[in-house]
Amino acid sequence: MKVLHVIPSLSPKHGGTSSLIPLMAGSLANAGLKVDVATTDDDGPGHRFEDLTNQRVERDGYGVYYFRKQTEFYKISLPFRKWIAGHVSDYDLVHVHVMFSYTSNSAARFARGLGVPYLISPHGVLNGWGMKNRRRLIKALSFQFVEKPILRYAAAMHYTSRAEQREAEQAGATAPAAVIPLGIDTTVLKNLPGPETFLNRFPQAKGRTLILFLSRLDAKKGLDLLLPVFAETRRKHPLAVLVIAGSGEEGYVAGLRDHADRLGLTGDIIWTGFLGGVDKLSALAAATVFILPSYSENFGIALMEAMAAGLPCLTTPGVALAEDVQARAADVLMVVPAEVKPLAAALGQLLGDAALRARLGANAKRMAAGQFTISSMGAAFKKLYAEIAQSPKQHP
């Protein structure tokens, strides 16, 4: 079976989904499928992978086609449109990632027109929070006239959690659904490097108790809660330092820094910017506690990575992974409402109880290694693809 994955960007600066696709493609290639990925040359706002534009690059068992983007918004790519029109019929299945993007919508439309079944993974873009808080009017119009027809003719919908499925179906998704949790490279996270790389790069963290937030800097991540939560926590734990690891839109990040200044936190927050590779792993090794106070997450890859690293984790009900973890086992995560007081109380409890931290970290690491692996994700998608291939094709 030959499968094409389509996503607007593979830049890790965009967070979990963009970082996940290479793992997914590799797992499917290892499972015996022929896999290609088509994307733009986007490397975050104002940047592009200049050396990769308009070419096919061989990766570990699969190929990636990079096409030049013409716009930041919507990631319009006319070279992609020309290519997908001529090549979509080369594939048995098209797996579309994310919606409200030119590449994803074009791929679905051309696949439908040529009778190639397509599967959609919305990756949270149909969640209620995003529909209401991100370009609400534009999204409502686009959804009605562009995305809704695409959803209607999808062979199936893939959701990362039951919570994501509920919200997408409330938004109007009606295609057959499959819930497949995302997988991560637990082998790397089980054997972390030492904290020295991080501590040498950010020496102000030495001798401190590290509270780690490691994710994209975005309004949905609850950073407006995290800052006052840390201000409250610091009163009882003066050695605590908050590490905010991630990148985001300049205006939004500047607003966060101003908020931190007004709270008197300037000397106790380390703004690292985007961390990847050994820097990211070393940050996980240096951390005492991981926190993700998001309002909305269709899964929560950053949380899963912290669990796999053996960190005690504090999160909120808006992170869909939390619901799935709690349904599988108790005493793995601390999950409290997305409000300052309960978050501050829970964070203080974690920092003050070493035994609790050790227990939660060990349980989290065990669950991640046993139930959220790349191989299990690949096997589940291979099975789903086979089921779609055996289903009657819809007529354009």
What annotation goes with each model-predicted range?
Residues 295:
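Aromatic "clamp/platform" in nucleotide-sugar-dependent glycosyltransferases that forms part
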Residues 251-254, 266-276, 283:
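Active-site donor-binding acidic/aromatic loop of nucleotide-activated sugar
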Residues 39, 143-195, 204-206:
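Donor nucleotide-sugar binding/catalytic pocket of nucleotide-sugar-dependent glycosyltransferases
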Residues 327-328, 332-340, 349-354:
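Conserved acidic donor-binding segment of nucleotide-sugar-dependent glycosyltransferases
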Residues 1-52, 56-63, 89:
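N-terminal subdomain of nucleotide-sugar transferases
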Residues 41-44, 184, 214, 241-257, ...:
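Glycosyltransferase donor-sugar binding loop
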Residues 4, 158, 204-221, 227-230, ...:
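Conserved donor-binding/catalytic core segment of Leloir-type glycosyltransferases
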Residues 312-316:
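Short hydrophobic beta-strand element within catalytic cores of glycosyltransferases
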